[in-house]
Amino acid sequence: PADPVPGDVDPVPAGQVGNRWFRVRRRILATCAIAVVLGLGYYFVSLAQVWITGRADDDGPVDAIVVMGAAQYDGRPSPQLAARLDHVVELWPQGIAPIVVVTGGNIPGDRFTEAEASATYLAERGVPLDALLHENDGSTSYESVEAVADLLAARGLDEVLIVTDPYHALRSRLIAEEVGLDARVSSTDTSVVTGGESLRRHLQEA
Protein backbone atom coordinates (compact mmCIF):
# COMPACT_ATOMS: atom_id res chain seq x y z
CA PRO A 1 0.00 0.00 0.00
CA ALA A 2 1.08 3.59 -0.65
CA ASP A 3 2.61 5.50 2.21
CA PRO A 4 0.26 8.17 3.66
CA VAL A 5 0.95 11.69 2.51
CA PRO A 6 2.27 13.82 5.39
CA GLY A 7 -0.53 15.94 6.85
CA ASP A 8 -3.27 13.60 5.79
CA VAL A 9 -5.70 12.83 8.63
CA ASP A 10 -8.09 9.98 8.58
CA PRO A 11 -11.65 11.29 8.74
CA VAL A 12 -13.46 10.75 12.05
CA PRO A 13 -16.34 8.37 11.60
CA ALA A 14 -19.70 10.14 11.63
CA GLY A 15 -20.82 8.05 14.57
CA GLN A 16 -17.97 9.29 16.75
CA VAL A 17 -18.70 12.92 15.83
CA GLY A 18 -22.31 12.40 16.87
CA ASN A 19 -21.28 10.81 20.15
CA ARG A 20 -18.92 13.66 20.97
CA TRP A 21 -21.62 16.27 20.28
CA PHE A 22 -24.08 14.30 22.40
CA ARG A 23 -21.64 14.29 25.34
CA VAL A 24 -20.97 18.03 24.99
CA ARG A 25 -24.67 18.79 24.80
CA ARG A 26 -25.36 16.60 27.82
CA ARG A 27 -22.71 18.45 29.84
CA ILE A 28 -24.18 21.80 28.83
CA LEU A 29 -27.68 20.69 29.81
CA ALA A 30 -26.40 19.27 33.11
CA THR A 31 -24.61 22.54 33.89
CA CYS A 32 -27.76 24.53 33.08
CA ALA A 33 -29.87 22.22 35.23
CA ILE A 34 -27.50 22.61 38.17
CA ALA A 35 -27.57 26.40 37.77
CA VAL A 36 -31.38 26.39 37.74
CA VAL A 37 -31.58 24.16 40.81
CA LEU A 38 -29.09 26.33 42.71
CA GLY A 39 -30.94 29.48 41.68
CA LEU A 40 -34.28 28.08 42.79
CA GLY A 41 -32.74 26.85 46.02
CA TYR A 42 -31.34 30.30 46.78
CA TYR A 43 -34.71 31.91 45.97
CA PHE A 44 -36.68 29.56 48.21
CA VAL A 45 -34.21 30.07 51.07
CA SER A 46 -34.71 33.83 50.66
CA LEU A 47 -38.47 33.36 50.57
CA ALA A 48 -38.32 31.33 53.78
CA GLN A 49 -36.32 34.11 55.45
CA VAL A 50 -38.90 36.69 54.38
CA TRP A 51 -41.71 34.49 55.72
CA ILE A 52 -40.04 33.64 59.04
CA THR A 53 -38.88 37.19 59.76
CA GLY A 54 -42.34 38.50 58.99
CA ARG A 55 -43.76 36.35 61.75
CA ALA A 56 -41.22 37.36 64.37
CA ASP A 57 -42.42 39.22 67.44
CA ASP A 58 -39.24 40.23 69.22
CA ASP A 59 -40.52 42.79 71.69
CA GLY A 60 -37.66 42.98 74.17
CA PRO A 61 -36.45 46.34 75.57
CA VAL A 62 -34.93 48.70 72.98
CA ASP A 63 -34.01 52.37 72.67
CA ALA A 64 -36.81 53.17 70.24
CA ILE A 65 -39.73 51.72 68.34
CA VAL A 66 -39.57 52.64 64.66
CA VAL A 67 -42.80 52.43 62.69
CA MET A 68 -42.34 52.32 58.94
CA GLY A 69 -44.44 54.76 56.94
CA ALA A 70 -47.10 54.03 54.35
CA ALA A 71 -49.68 56.08 52.50
CA GLN A 72 -51.70 58.79 54.23
CA TYR A 73 -54.65 60.76 52.93
CA ASP A 74 -54.68 64.40 54.00
CA GLY A 75 -53.43 63.57 57.47
CA ARG A 76 -55.37 60.34 57.86
CA PRO A 77 -53.33 57.12 57.81
CA SER A 78 -54.25 54.60 55.13
CA PRO A 79 -55.58 51.27 56.41
CA GLN A 80 -52.13 49.76 55.90
CA LEU A 81 -50.41 52.47 57.93
CA ALA A 82 -53.16 52.42 60.58
CA ALA A 83 -52.57 48.68 61.13
CA ARG A 84 -48.89 49.36 61.80
CA LEU A 85 -49.74 52.21 64.15
CA ASP A 86 -52.31 50.10 66.02
CA HIS A 87 -49.53 47.60 66.70
CA VAL A 88 -47.43 50.40 68.18
CA VAL A 89 -50.38 51.37 70.38
CA GLU A 90 -50.45 47.78 71.67
CA LEU A 91 -46.70 47.77 72.32
CA TRP A 92 -46.45 51.17 74.00
CA PRO A 93 -47.99 50.24 77.41
CA GLN A 94 -45.50 47.37 77.70
CA GLY A 95 -42.65 49.84 78.26
CA ILE A 96 -40.54 48.36 75.48
CA ALA A 97 -39.05 51.75 74.56
CA PRO A 98 -39.25 55.37 75.71
CA ILE A 99 -39.34 56.71 72.14
CA VAL A 100 -41.40 56.03 69.03
CA VAL A 101 -39.96 57.20 65.72
CA VAL A 102 -42.57 57.86 63.03
CA THR A 103 -41.27 57.87 59.48
CA GLY A 104 -42.10 58.90 55.95
CA GLY A 105 -42.27 62.05 53.86
CA ASN A 106 -44.91 63.18 51.40
CA ILE A 107 -45.48 63.60 47.71
CA PRO A 108 -45.99 66.94 45.93
CA GLY A 109 -49.41 68.33 46.76
CA ASP A 110 -49.74 66.60 50.14
CA ARG A 111 -50.34 68.83 53.14
CA PHE A 112 -49.01 66.27 55.60
CA THR A 113 -46.16 63.81 55.74
CA GLU A 114 -46.64 60.15 56.60
CA ALA A 115 -44.75 60.85 59.83
CA GLU A 116 -47.08 63.71 60.78
CA ALA A 117 -50.17 61.61 60.11
CA SER A 118 -48.68 58.80 62.17
CA ALA A 119 -47.79 61.08 65.08
CA THR A 120 -51.30 62.52 65.25
CA TYR A 121 -52.85 59.06 65.16
CA LEU A 122 -50.60 57.75 67.94
CA ALA A 123 -51.05 60.83 70.13
CA GLU A 124 -54.83 60.46 69.89
CA ARG A 125 -54.42 56.90 71.18
CA GLY A 126 -52.28 57.58 74.20
CA VAL A 127 -48.68 57.81 73.04
CA PRO A 128 -47.28 61.06 74.53
CA LEU A 129 -46.25 63.73 72.05
CA ASP A 130 -42.91 64.16 73.80
CA ALA A 131 -42.16 60.48 73.13
CA LEU A 132 -42.53 60.92 69.36
CA LEU A 133 -39.65 61.63 67.01
CA HIS A 134 -40.38 62.58 63.40
CA GLU A 135 -38.51 61.51 60.29
CA ASN A 136 -40.32 63.59 57.69
CA ASP A 137 -38.19 63.34 54.56
CA GLY A 138 -37.81 59.71 53.50
CA SER A 139 -39.45 58.67 50.25
CA THR A 140 -38.16 55.08 50.38
CA SER A 141 -37.61 52.57 53.15
CA TYR A 142 -33.85 53.02 52.84
CA GLU A 143 -34.01 56.82 53.06
CA SER A 144 -36.29 56.70 56.08
CA VAL A 145 -34.25 54.16 58.03
CA GLU A 146 -31.00 55.93 57.20
CA ALA A 147 -32.46 59.20 58.52
CA VAL A 148 -33.72 57.40 61.64
CA ALA A 149 -30.20 56.10 62.27
CA ASP A 150 -28.90 59.68 62.17
CA LEU A 151 -31.65 60.92 64.51
CA LEU A 152 -30.91 58.22 67.05
CA ALA A 153 -27.12 58.42 66.73
CA ALA A 154 -27.34 62.09 67.74
CA ARG A 155 -28.91 60.85 70.98
CA GLY A 156 -26.46 58.00 71.48
CA LEU A 157 -29.10 55.38 70.65
CA ASP A 158 -29.01 52.45 68.24
CA GLU A 159 -31.27 49.60 69.44
CA VAL A 160 -34.60 49.61 67.62
CA LEU A 161 -37.73 47.55 67.22
CA ILE A 162 -39.14 47.99 63.71
CA VAL A 163 -42.89 47.78 63.25
CA THR A 164 -44.14 47.08 59.73
CA ASP A 165 -46.05 44.55 57.63
CA PRO A 166 -44.83 40.93 57.63
CA TYR A 167 -43.68 40.96 54.00
CA HIS A 168 -41.65 44.14 54.65
CA ALA A 169 -39.96 43.02 57.87
CA LEU A 170 -36.82 41.36 56.56
CA ARG A 171 -35.94 44.16 54.15
CA SER A 172 -36.49 46.79 56.85
CA ARG A 173 -34.29 44.92 59.31
CA LEU A 174 -31.51 44.40 56.78
CA ILE A 175 -31.55 48.10 55.86
CA ALA A 176 -31.40 49.03 59.54
CA GLU A 177 -28.44 46.75 60.12
CA GLU A 178 -26.69 48.16 57.05
CA VAL A 179 -26.92 51.72 58.39
CA GLY A 180 -25.62 50.72 61.81
CA LEU A 181 -28.72 50.01 63.88
CA ASP A 182 -29.15 47.02 66.16
CA ALA A 183 -32.53 46.04 64.79
CA ARG A 184 -35.31 43.64 65.66
CA VAL A 185 -38.79 43.43 64.19
CA SER A 186 -42.34 43.09 65.43
CA SER A 187 -44.73 42.71 62.52
CA THR A 188 -48.35 43.72 62.75
CA ASP A 189 -50.76 40.79 62.78
CA THR A 190 -53.63 42.96 61.52
CA SER A 191 -52.09 43.86 58.17
CA VAL A 192 -54.60 44.67 55.45
CA VAL A 193 -52.24 43.08 52.93
CA THR A 194 -53.64 39.55 52.90
CA GLY A 195 -54.38 36.62 50.62
CA GLY A 196 -53.01 36.71 47.11
CA GLU A 197 -51.61 40.21 47.50
CA SER A 198 -49.66 39.15 50.58
CA LEU A 199 -48.28 36.15 48.70
CA ARG A 200 -47.31 38.33 45.75
CA ARG A 201 -45.43 40.75 47.96
CA HIS A 202 -43.65 37.95 49.82
CA LEU A 203 -42.53 36.50 46.48
CA GLN A 204 -41.41 39.93 45.34
CA GLU A 205 -39.40 40.57 48.51
CA ALA A 206 -37.58 37.24 48.14
Residue ranges and their predicted role:
Residues 1-3, 16:
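N-terminal targeting leader peptides, primarily classical Sec-type signal peptides for secretion
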Residues 3, 7, 47-200:
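A structural signal for short, hydrophobic/glycine-enriched beta-strand patches
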Residues 11, 15-57:
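N-terminal type II signal-anchor transmembrane helix
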Residues 202-206:
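Short, intrinsically disordered, charge-balanced linker/junction segments flanking boundaries
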